[in-house]
Amino acid sequence: MRRLDVTAADLARMKANGSLELPEMQRGYVWTASRVRDLFDSLYRGYPTGVILVWEGESSHVRRSAIQQPVPRPGASYLLLDGQQRVTSLAAVLLGEKVRVRNRTRPIELLFNLEHPEEVVAEDFDEDDDKEPEEEEDRLVAATRGKTFVVATTRLADDPRWVNVSKLFTDALRPRDAVRNAYGTLDSPEADRALDRLEKLRAIRDYPYIM
């Protein structure tokens, strides 16, 4: 099996266009939004996130994808043996695709903190995907000030210092507009730092994977 060097954006596109398929034996998508948040935090910091194991070729025994896919093109598919959770998460966030998990189809909405600390802050809470967004909102807002990524909540989504990650990757929101919304100007040390951070965030698309 030959080695392929791909990027996070390549994997997301391959998942969305149907050229990466799941063998029937693979379990479905099970990651919570909090797991996706942790993946993107690792990508942002350049941490290792593993390899993607595939088998080149077609199979009639494939599982339905957790995201919407067209009919795969003949002769252009890979069977995804290991890495399904990561690849589906990449497609969901980088392309803004909805995912089917726990019998529900919904987007995975992450927010990026323009004012995050440079150091990693130890986790002292976890978002519960099954709770209503308004529940414990005050506690979450206070606890997330030191975080880089969080699962979106209603109150944080209304704060311009927290940027919707999928909107940034799908170009629904430009970095300069996001910074202007947050600081009212592009001409300040805070604005310069925020622009640098958003460019670093967008560089996740070029994160290298071995497949």
Language model segments and positions:
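Basic- and aromatic-enriched surface patches that contact anionic nucleotides/nucleic acids
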Residues: 1-211
